[in-house]
Amino acid sequence: MKNGLEDYYVIRGNKKMRFGYTTGSCAAAACKGATEILLGGKLQETVTLMTPKGILLTLELKDIQIETDKVTCAIRKDAGDDPDTTNGILVYATVEKTKEQGITLDGGIGVGRVTKAGLSQKIGEAAINPVPKSMILRATTETAEKYDYEGGLKIIISVPEGVEIGKKTFNPRLGIVGGISILGTSGIVEPMSEAALVQSIRVEMKQHFSQGEEYLLVTPGNYGADYLREHMDLPYEKNIKCSNYVGETIDMAIDMGVKGILFIAHIGKFVKVAAGIMNTHSHSADARMEVLASNAIRAGAPLECAKEILNASTTDEALDILNRYQMTQGTMKEVLDRIQFYLNHRSYEQILLGAVVFSNTCGYLGQTADAAKLIEQINIQNEKIKDK
């Protein structure tokens, strides 16, 4: 069955990658289908839904359950060619007639509950984001009007597989427990969407900021988080993972009024920042050996040292070479100076930025000029938050 997305795709790496649709679209379509059956009195196999992006979806209704004054049905999530943990799950909507006027919406099993401030929903509410909520209520209202129904309706969105899937998402870090969030701003999933990941980072940053954290502690990935926990006297539970998006993280911090960011980063990622590379994914750029070799020369290393570094495969191997030439300290000073320069360049010095850099084999390699100020501010901030 055609779903309306057959002509929508992007080309990445010479491959045609299909669009998909969000959990928000699934919830709205399931809700529309359940309402149609409940009020229209006729069984139907498909439902159409216009997404905010302007793409009309035609989706198959699954697991239809009809009771007195209540109908439940589901839509199977199709994320297209996006690597999405929710791909293939069933998103259910139960719509029930009520004596009270108006439409109520809540989450059932597998839809997370908000336990911390700073999100779009209040504490205790279901993690159904604003656009999906609007889509669900609009679809239900329009269907009720179609059948001249003036009574009340109660909607429950549930995702049975969401309890386990939610544990693998950002939700536990955001204080959303018990399941996944019902997401989507356009209703459509674009393959390998960087925008979606950057948006999830923004949400986490905003939440930390709303809780009084004006100085943020950021780690690009698991290595940074592990080093922070095991080797630094800083509040590990406050760390935010920015993945490869160093530049975007700085931009978003400035936009929301953050005063500073301290990055705790592995040399393999952050050495790229010393060349002004603000997206550290290898698909975007990889100048690790060139950066280390040029800064080794700047620090006074012999040409042979630089040549060996250029032939190295990993930063750990390059560090072994620098150690052998006794050039690690001098080279890292140059690298850290360049990192500080490019961090400030990205922010136009609007906020305080710094980094602590390490490797898995050598441990602590150094920190940028403003890192000490940031460490002090984060610890002061943490004590103030504890005292509240």
Task: Give the predicted meaning of each segment.
Residues M1, A93, P191, D387-K388:
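Intrinsic structural disorder
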Residues K2-G4, Y8-V10, R18, L174-I180, ...:
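A structural signal for small-residue-enriched, beta-sheet-centric alpha/beta enzyme cores
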Residues K2-K168, P172-L174:
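Generic N-terminal targeting/processing segments that precede catalytic cores or assembly contacts
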Residues L90-Y92, H231-L234, T368-L374:
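Surface-exposed flexible segments
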Residues K133, L336, Q340-K388:
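Extended hydrophobic packing segments that form well-structured cores
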Residues E164, A225, Y364:
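Flexible, glycine-rich phosphate/dinucleotide-binding loops
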